[in-house]
UniProtKB/Swiss-Prot annotation:
Gene3D superfamilies: Ribosomal protein S7 domain (1.10.455.10). The gene is rpsG. This is Small ribosomal subunit protein uS7. One of its GO terms (molecular function) is rRNA binding. It holds the Pfam family Ribosomal_S7. CDD domains: uS7_Bacteria. Belongs to the universal ribosomal protein uS7 family. One of its GO terms (biological process) is translation. SUPFAM superfamilies: Ribosomal protein S7 (SSF47973). InterPro entries: Ribosomal_uS7, Ribosomal_uS7_bac/org-type, Ribosomal_uS7_dom, Ribosomal_uS7_dom_sf. The lineage of its organism: Bacteria, Pseudomonadati, Pseudomonadota, Alphaproteobacteria, Rickettsiales. It comes from Orientia tsutsugamushi (strain Boryong) (Rickettsia tsutsugamushi). Part of the 30S ribosomal subunit. Contacts proteins S9 and S11.
Length: 173
């Protein structure tokens, strides 16, 4: 047993800019703030907020859809329900599937959307890449959805080892 204190989970406060939008639900505001925090480099949050404004306007003008709804549906289509953990037992390493916490699933979804947007080559700027990736993910296409499907296939392929994670957790390790 570890003698260290449990880490207190810090909540990231949503931007005041998006809280004032009455059309956005609290879940959409939470996803927007997660996206902003994941994209922020060197504390330059205002730059990323302007970039998110461009993303939402681009989706609104090009696809005639609400940007926050596209963000929410994209994250719901990309978020995983299972993840694969490496577990070393008796000199062998097993890939063991385990369920994903909902907050972690949204974090993984946003991370996968950003990574697959960064790998896109057709658009010039990052905000265009993210806007296109969000729209494709909301329609069930794109690199982030493929990453989720690959993750689920890996979990299904290693379903035989799922009993190991429950034994491991019940022992307290």
């Amino acid at each position: 047993m570890s003698r260290r204190c449990t880490e207190v989970k810090r909540k990231s406060l949503p931007s005041n800019k998006y809280q004032s939008i009455s059309a956005a639900t609290p879940n959409q505001i939470m996803l927007a703030s997660k996206l902003i925090n994941k994209l922020t480099h060197h504390g330059n949050k205002e730059l990323v907020e302007k970039m998110l404004d461009k993303i939402i306007q681009h989706i609104k003008h090009k696809y005639k859809a609400d940007g926050f709804e596209v963000l929410e549906s994209a994250c719901n289509n990309v978020k995983p329900s299972l993840q694969v953990e490496s577990l070393r037992i008796g000199g062998a390493t097993y890939q063991v599937p385990s369920p994903v916490n909902e907050l972690r699933s949204y974090t993984l979804a946003i991370k996968w959307i950003i990574n697959s947007a960064a790998n896109r080559t057709f658009e010039k700027s990052m905000w265009q890449k993210i806007a296109e990736e969000l729209y494709e993910a909301s329609n069930g296409r794109g690199g982030a959805v493929k990453k989720k499907d690959d993750n689920h296939k890996m979990a299904e392929a290693n379903q035989a080892f799922s009993h190991l994670i429950t034994k491991r957790r019940s022992r307290g390790n």
